[in-house]
């Protein structure tokens, strides 16, 4: 199987191995996705020229289209790191998590999601989430059990925990953006720059528009005196740093668990 014989919309062993490993991880940063791609070529088609990542993924997506599955690219809300996740397009509801969680666990996630969406900060405190345990559908759940389930959501990359508070992982945003828009139309927040769903971000104190932190960083990158893109009033928040993939490559360090990635590359 040489590179010259590969055609668009044809899944080779390289593509199949890549897809299988991405499914295992659920979501990966771009740096790890590129490493995974190189690994798959090394195993199955060592002499082939490695396709550009965008072309490689588009090829897979063209085959997956009929199955209503897609590899989607997004960015982390806190620092703008590119991520990729395998997304089920056939359903937009939380039911896509049903294979991994019981009914009462899914309802706990739904309660946590509501708190996160309704909050101004994009976070829901563990205390507030656990206080809703008595309202869950299905089998009764103790607070100690609920704490363990929340950690399971974190391990499966549906939630992120920071200092006792929870927010949505980039995987959850990629998978559930349409569901969130449809279910919480009055509470949902949209970024003024990229117009996609916003969970965490900054807002203008004058007109109220919101921006993702990475969008804030890029928009005000060269502005000595940042002003709101909507009302032109002074932007009072600290401007975050722009994620630099070049520096990331130089350091060779990713936030994700490299050991875990290597252990699953087989």
Swiss-Prot record:
Organism lineage string: Eukaryota, Metazoa, Chordata, Craniata, Vertebrata
PANTHER family for this protein: NON-SMC ELEMENT 1-RELATED (PTHR20973), NON-STRUCTURAL MAINTENANCE OF CHROMOSOMES ELEMENT 1 HOMOLOG (PTHR20973:SF0)
Basic residues composition bias: residue spans: 256-266
Record organism: Pongo abelii (Sumatran orangutan)
Gene name as annotated: NSMCE1
Reaction it catalyzes: S-ubiquitinyl-[E2 ubiquitin-conjugating enzyme]-L-cysteine + [acceptor protein]-L-lysine = [E2 ubiquitin-conjugating enzyme]-L-cysteine + N(6)-ubiquitinyl-[acceptor protein]-L-lysine
Keywords, ordered alphabetically: Chromosome, DNA damage, DNA recombination, DNA repair, Metal-binding, Nucleus, Phosphoprotein, Telomere, Transferase, Ubl conjugation, Ubl conjugation pathway, Zinc, Zinc-finger
Protein name: Non-structural maintenance of chromosomes element 1 homolog
EC numbers for this chain: 2.3.2.27
Region spans: Disordered: 245-266
